Amino acid sequence: MALQSAPKLLYSSPSPSVFSANERRVAFSDFVGLSKKRSRRRRIAGTFRNFPALSAVSSAIKAVVDVDRAHHSTDSGSPTVSTSSHPLDQQVVNLEDILAERGACGVGFIANLDNKGSFQIVKDALTALGCMEHRGGCGSDNDSGDGSGVMTAIPWDLFNDWGKDQGIGPFDRSHTGVGMVFLPKDDLLAEEAKKVVLDTFAQEGIEVIGWRSVPTNVSVVGRNAKETMPNIQQVFVRIIKEDSTDDIERELYICRKLIERAASSHTWASELYFCSLSNQTIIYKGMLRSEVLGMFYYDLQNERYTSPFAIYHRRYSTNTSPRWPLAQPMRFLGHNGEINTIQGNLNWMRSREPSIQSPVWRGRENEIRPYGNPKASDSANLDSAAELLIRSGRTPEEALMILVPEAYKNHPTLMIKYPEAVDFYDYYKGQMETWDGPALLLFSDGKTVGACLDRNGLRPARYWRTVDNVVYVASEVGVLPMDESKVTMKGRLGPGMMISVDLSSGQVYENTEVKKRVASSNPYGKWVKENLRSLKAVNFLSRALLENDTILRNQQAFGYSSEDVQMVIESMASQGKEPTFCMGDDIPLAVMSQKPHMLYDYFKQRFAQVTNPAIDPLREGLVMSLEVNIGKRGNILEVGPENASQVILPSPVLNEGELEALVNDPLLKAQMLPIFFDIRKGVEGTLEKRLNRLCEAADEAVRNGSQMLVLSDRSEELEPTRPAIPILLAVGAVHQHLIQNGLRMYTSIVVDTAQCFSTHQFACLIGYGASAICPYLALETCRQWRLSNKTVNLMRTGKIPTVTIEQAQKNFCKAVKSGLLKILSKMGISLLSSYCGAQIFEIYGLGKDVVDIAFQGSVSKMGGLTLDELARETLSFWVKAFSEDTAKRLENFGFIQFRPGGEYHVNNPEMSKLLHKAVRNKSESAYAVYQQHLANRPVSVLRDLLEFKSDRAPISVGKVEPATSIVERFCTGGMSLGAISRETHEAIAIAMNRLGGKSNSGEGGEDPIRWRPLTDVVDGYSSTLPHLKGLQNGDTATSAIKQVASGRFGVTPTFLVNADQIEIKIAQGAKPGEGGQLPGKKVSAYIARLRNSKPGVPLISPPPHHDIYSIEDLAQLIYDLHQINPKEKVSVKLVAEAGIGTVASGVAKGNADIIQVSGHDGGTGASPISSIKHAGGPWELGLSETHQTLISNGLRERVILRVDGGLKCGVDVMMAAAMGADEYGFGSLAMIATGCVMARICHTNNCPVGVASQREELRARFPGVPGDLVNFFLYVAEEVRGILAQLGFEKLDDIIGRTDILKPRDISLMKTQHLDLSYILASAGLPTMSSTAIRKQEVHTNGPVLDDQILSDPEIIDAIENEKIVNKTVKIFNVDRAVCGRIAGVIAKKYGDTGFAGQLNLTFEGSAGQSFAVFLTPGMNIRLVGESNDYVGKGMAGGELIVTPAENPGFRPEDATIVGNTCLYGATGGQIFVRGKAGERFAVRNSLAEAVVEGTGDHCCEYMTGGCVVILGKVGRNVAAGMTGGLAYILDEDDTLIPKVNKEIVKIQRVTAPVGQMQLKNLIEAHVEKTGSSKGASILKDWDKYLPLFWQLVPPSEEDTPEASAMFEQMTSEGASLQSA
């Protein structure tokens, strides 16, 4: 297929067009790392529909497909078929295997409702696929696609032609199956594999008719993909013994499973893969770019290839080594997204294998096991689960409603109008754990085609229907040219929604129709009502049960410290929420500590970053649930009332009475299992033996019918020789044992324990298998606290809130529940039932024997304690409780707050004093003392276990690169102005600019006054920055790195164009997966001005970026930022955790210039204690994994690697360099050097030296000067020089990635004897470029973009330069992304955010790509005639944006979705008018923009802090969540709005204030004038009728404004009268 030439841009303007026909050709040679060969081969397969009027459009799309990609990827390895002879002996579900495969995609389907097969459907699918190339990735060769493919009906005409030629056709369609097979590349091995296939079919009585070598064009395959390209063949079989389609499909499914099992013992097993084996569908796919797919497979070019439908898929994988089988579609599904709960899902699927039975399998269930493959991707495993259900008789729609249910509990419409659907979900909630995570799922079994969206609606999905009876669904609109007059319906899938096409009947079933049909198939409501029991709430105890001495002994025995009791339990009992703290976790890891730790401390929570988003549990709680079902889970393949026989709990937190009620439930047959072990014969081996006996007892109890096991450490009297097994170890061991023995589905594990009091501990127990926990000692501690004289006195004097004894316990449980929601949400998980058993933790410091017995599959990279050592640590608590000199109070271990004699804190007072002395006195000797202090400290971090080595002779320091060169690699952390004071923020920036290093603005914007050099300094003071001292003329206070965080506060076009680098903060070391909130008391007038908000109004930063729900979304934001400022480098900040290397690969392919790896020990202004202590990992492991993965994938040279988190000195810098870092970040140390005294009260706004306070009287005490920080960094650089000289190296470049200069220290600590540091010391090789060369590379480019051509027009240039008015009209396509962003950048650089007096009136016609009209500035008036995708108007600071459908559409505009999700995100000005509906999260985090739209999805106006939004149609759920400023007006014609509004903050009222009425009417009038809206015109025509139907949403900050208060004018006039009087 020849590449068609591109047409001219279709402009209409007063003057002739200046754009030539060649201007929009594909021009890849400008891209970083792309060769001419690549440019020539960049083509799109297939042709467009023959719409004569749009032929130019077709050609244009072909010419511009993906002109902006400079980042690509592929996958690694091949899926491993289980080699087990029995499914229960299969490989353990290992998190590291799962984390190696992550990704996202672009997907869609086309279906003809008349069920007419045509080649046009196939061509259109390939065209649409090509127009989503930007959603895919390529490997390090820039040419091997991550994967693309199509699923269609079997092209019988094509195959019959071939069959006739071979003398074996035509085929009997009703009894012929076709397999699309990847065989081993080696010819001999391929023949072996074919023999296994033949033998298996023969064994099943199925005739193999013939094999067909699939004709392919290998020349279009990328180098990496070609190396692993399989031998691709098709096998044709005849099935005579079955007649029905379902039975034939089942027989083929069994055959495929048997072939996989037979092949598993061969070395080539992983190279044999059936893409499809069916009588209905076939899949063509491979590690190919989307535009190459149709050229690679000649079949797809053959007009005899006809199909009534096609599903297409383009993959973006974070991994890069080609892996052909993981291209999609899978056998039933095309998946765009990621399953967060995959490890738990696989464990539970493995657990249910023995219980799965169905008559349709005729006793052959054993032959179709296993149902999952831990070596495959999450998408492949979800497909396997769906395949099992569908082949067992479920429809695809029903299967996906079971696996991926919507958030039905808080859905008023569903509960009122479709109760049968609610009953269906209630029934299956106890049978199948949700496969949770972002997911747009396309599905087909050949009879139906459809799509559904996850419960959170986190992937885009648009659909439309035409007059010729074709339905389209796609990740983006504009992937095909459409005559709008022939489009009869346009819409989008919202959260949890589904659309289905029945190919035989030609019916299209939209969401509620699908759900109702499925749910009505059985009497689920009757079964649930009769069998599902709810646990009734039982009152908390009103008296203490233990004497003071007894409770003290219990607390000591079970590992409590005074900090645990006072700062955690008592705080939660008093406040009802989790306590917060600050400054990060600066104590040793548990395995390196000299203090005893509870087992939980060896576990770190995992969290979402990049590949899936975190959730806001406070503002989006409607999608979350802590409900738990207790009891036996039934056979998922059969339905019946007995499956509903369970007890439902509202949460997993039980009090004593509720536990007793469960134990007494006769149907559960609860069995109590005590967990004490006897040490009278010694400790060695005792714990392991007792665990084995516990597991055997659990096994026996389940076989005897117990549906609830209660593991308990409760005893009337504790015995000194019978300590309790760590409850987490007991739960994990029993859970794993029951899985391995096929018994796990028959029972629930409930815990009755003293060893649980923090949210992290609850999460660990649930994550490793417990369904519910009764924390009896924590509840007793709450009771004792409430009854103590001290508490009574504090309540009497009003120093703490007054609570009853019952309320204290209720508060504690409330805090635990909210903490659990936060832990789930930071991983992006909505349901506790999905979290249970999902093992979403990383282990630091436990040995293989511990992991194998209780935590199989969890990541544990460094080994650690053995079972016997763990027993001794447990015993150390027990011994203290029974020793003769037992303390009369709990010990304070100092794990949270520094205290003399407590746990060692790296950031201790002595360290701070030594550093202050060195930098303030500019004393080298004092710095040497500081160095010695660090060198002599206890082992605290992983790098303390390492030391340098070298085979080189030392050299003179004079030969080493100068300190001035080294300091250029230093940067400071992203500390927001708001969290820290203006004085601190500016002093740090000035110091870094003096050095040539980089400071980081943090979130919140930056005062433009800081962008100019100081010229008015006299005696160290400047009238420009009068609050600072120690200044010099020429100083600048600008932050070289400007941060884009989730709240987008202060992010304006001018802010971005004045950056040297832009950092996208995905996560923060001290609280990864969480957002933030700047309290109103810290929002001064100055802070409010910078953040475009009001003083005193709390400012909420969401947990996720709402334009980053996947890896391709991140690539889009990077694209947006490169668009507005092509000269800036874009960095992405990640936090160390298992799998970060895989994520980093995707980030590198997403065109990031810098990747920053942050350690868990980074600082924070405020965070929950559990997050500070128990989330994130050491940067040593994260950096090593990132560097090694990038090296292995050939991506290391693309990015600068930066590291931060607890760096203190030159030794730390050298260690980080050896592990692969190019640059080095200092956060807490930079603050200490500028005056911080580590008071650790940042979160209170009471910092005694004004470093972290907005109180003016405290800020006046700020002691720092920029020179102090300059001195510190120069000392660090000189220290680096000294070490380099000792090792014999002349420059840092020489050691970066050289782990061979590191070796383990000869040191033996109490708990580190079995630590294995080989992971850190491993080497994957070195980059092919030096670090300096990598750092000096040009910024990654977006390549040729539409904005560049617009900016080349002389009239546009003249209008910008001379502030004139110009009018232009431009054609636009979905591949044109971030259009207007570069134009806005040019204007902002010249005029700032408000200075441009000209007008650029640009009209775009067509379907705009993502981020249309991004970062608009005043003077830019943009009109789109057509439709757009996600992120319209993102970050706009001014101007006007109008979106209207094309003229004479075949649909009603007010009923159609014409803009996508997350529009107006972070807007700080301007107006937008949309004639039609928007998707989810319209106006999220809007600051000052005004908008009119005719309907929205869920979460509209979320986190708004200003501006005004008018909605003239229906809205989704959760309106105005987190909205602290601005106003919203919503038309409510059918009286359904109020239940949809999140009432936590806003007040709902009618529009009664005359000023508000005028504001509303003026905006609607403008909307009608600019868009021609018929809906708006109808409202204005009958204003008196419609005005009372509007609601006004008013947050507290707006209550006294004239727009919201009808009393305002009266009060104003009365005040004026009084003044005149």
Curated annotation (Swiss-Prot):
Residues noted as binding [3Fe-4S] cluster in the record, renumbered to the chain: C1236, C1242, C1247
Transit peptide, residue positions per record: 1-57
GO terms under biological process: ammonia assimilation cycle; glutamate biosynthetic process; L-glutamate biosynthetic process
Entry's cofactor comment: Binds 1 [3Fe-4S] cluster.
Subunit structure and binding partners: Interacts with ferredoxin. Interacts (via FMN-binding domain) with SQD1.
Catalysed reaction equations from the record: 2 oxidized [2Fe-2S]-[ferredoxin] + 2 L-glutamate = L-glutamine + 2 reduced [2Fe-2S]-[ferredoxin] + 2-oxoglutarate + 2 H(+)
Active-site residues, Swiss-Prot/TrEMBL: C105 (nucleophile)
GO MF entry, a single one: glutamate synthase (ferredoxin) activity
Family assignment from sequence similarity: Belongs to the glutamate synthase family.
Pathway, per record: Amino-acid biosynthesis; L-glutamate biosynthesis via GLT pathway; L-glutamate from 2-oxoglutarate and L-glutamine (ferredoxin route): step 1/1; Energy metabolism; nitrogen metabolism
Pfam families in the cross-refs: GATase_2, Glu_syn_central, Glu_synthase, GXGXG
Domain Glutamine amidotransferase type-2: 105-504
Function: Catalyzes the reductive conversion of 2-oxoglutarate plus glutamine to two molecules of glutamate, using reduced ferredoxin as the electron donor. Contains one FMN but no FAD. The FMN-binding domain is also involved in the delivery of sulfite to the reaction center of SQD1.
Phylogenetic placement of the source organism: Eukaryota, Viridiplantae, Streptophyta, Embryophyta, Tracheophyta
One Gene Ontology term, aspect cellular component: chloroplast stroma
Positions bound to FMN: 1183-1240
Listed cofactors: [3Fe-4S] cluster; FMN
Protein name: Ferredoxin-dependent glutamate synthase, chloroplastic
Top-level EC class: oxidoreductase
Entry EC no(s): 1.4.7.1
